[in-house]
């Protein structure tokens, strides 16, 4: 094989390699491979997105007491929404919703978010947590909003230990 053929073959190989490797850049940051569903409870209805929904029970399995509903609610719309209620279908338990400060409704501002659970955030407390659900289950939850209506999803039920300790019913 002559020297010029070797150089030509080497150049062709280098070009082919760069085309293959650089073509991945054309996929953009919204490639299908990036559409991985998270392993936490999340859904969207209209302009409302609910992410990372959990029901956090007492730390000890035998302990009685309240449980907390935690989630982040995003409003991508142009008008504010009010979180009117949270229900757990199939149960008769009551969920008490309180804003982060003061009294009144929990409002999700247009283009904003509300975090339920944790210090300094709005809260949603299930008065009789153990009657509603058990650790390890998936509990159906319905968030009722003033404009969007019902937003339903299944939330993981976890005890207030580890990462969830600061978001649980006593937080």
Q: Where on the chain are the PLM-derived regions?
A:
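Acidic, negatively charged sequence tracts
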Residues: 26-28
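C-terminal motif of bacterial Sec signal peptides marking the signal peptidase cleavage site
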Residues: 20-24
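Alpha-helical transmembrane segments
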Residues: 15-19
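Compact, glycine-rich, soluble single-domain proteins
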Residues: 30-144, 154-171
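Short acidic/polar inter-strand loop motif in beta-rich domains
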Residues: 148-151
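Bacterial N-terminal signal peptides that target proteins for export
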Residues: 1-12
């Amino acid at each position: 094989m002559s020297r010029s053929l070797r150089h030509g073959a080497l150049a062709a190989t280098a070009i082919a390699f760069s085309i293959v490797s650089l073509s991945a850049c054309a996929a953009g940051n919204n490639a299908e491979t990036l559409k991985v569903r998270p392993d936490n409870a999340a859904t969207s209805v209209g302009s409302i997105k609910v992410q990372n929904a959990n029901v956090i029970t007492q730390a000890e399995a035998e302990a009685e007491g309240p449980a907390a509903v935690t989630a982040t609610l995003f409003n991508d719309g142009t008008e504010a929404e009010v979180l009117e209620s949270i229900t757990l279908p199939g149960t008769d338990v009551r969920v008490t919703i309180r804003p982060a400060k003061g009294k009144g409704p929990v409002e999700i501002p247009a283009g904003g978010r509300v975090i339920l659970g944790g210090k300094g955030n709005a809260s949603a407390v299930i008065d009789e947590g153990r009657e509603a659900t058990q650790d390890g289950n998936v509990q159906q939850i319905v968030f009722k909003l003033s404009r969007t209506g019902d937003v339903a999803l299944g939330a993981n039920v976890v005890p207030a230990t580890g990462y969830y300790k600061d978001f649980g019913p006593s937080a």
